[in-house]
């Protein structure tokens, strides 16, 4: 069982321990990359698995989540794939693999 809206940042983490086996971290909910990384570390320390997801966004919005996804058990960063047109340059997806953002997208 994975907490999604029940765990937005570290303030919500204590109520999830014992109720869930995992949390879904989204940068939009956490307030940015710094809190998302801190939440992931705290969740691991509490024995919870990590999923990193995203809202509908361009590649620029998903690029920092690529960092938070390192070490996550599940990753769902398909937001740019749901757009009719993404920005250029865009994150490259091939056969289910997401490649690191190009430096021109997110230094």
Question: What are these language model-derived features?
Answer:
Residues 1, 17-24, 42-49, 69-75:
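Glycine-enriched alpha-helix->loop->beta-strand junction motifs that scaffold or abut catalytic
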Residues 1-9, 21-32, 53:
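Catalytic beta/alpha-barrel core
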Residues 4, 9-12, 28, 45, ...:
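Acidic-enriched, low-complexity/disordered segments with a strong bias for Aspartate over Glutamate
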Residues 10-12, 31-42, 61:
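Active-site-adjacent beta->alpha loops and helix N-cap segments on the catalytic face
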Residues 16-18, 38-40, 66-67, 90-91:
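Short, glycine/charged-enriched secondary-structure capping and boundary segments
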Residues 55-107:
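Flexible C-terminal active-site loop/helix
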